[in-house]
């Protein structure tokens, strides 16, 4: 089963604008108005706190300009910043196997293979 995925390089974009774009695209992809898309982006320094985040793990930063966002994902705290390429896949998982463990493992293998080549 092969699916085409749009790859969109957003360049540098702040986290909030990228998050808003993901939410808008998610609706369009689920309704079939847009095809599956992978957004690639570089953020200014930002920390995101997943649903399992322990705020004690967030060390005080040297700069008060670093923003912190609570986000709708699992995990703890993640840092994004300059020089780091971040990928956000917006996919209709109904078109794939409906097993999230399969999806995460497949995504991991694709990234490993891509970086190895």
Predicted region positions:
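N-terminal lobe of the biotin/lipoate ligase/transferase fold
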Residues: 1-117
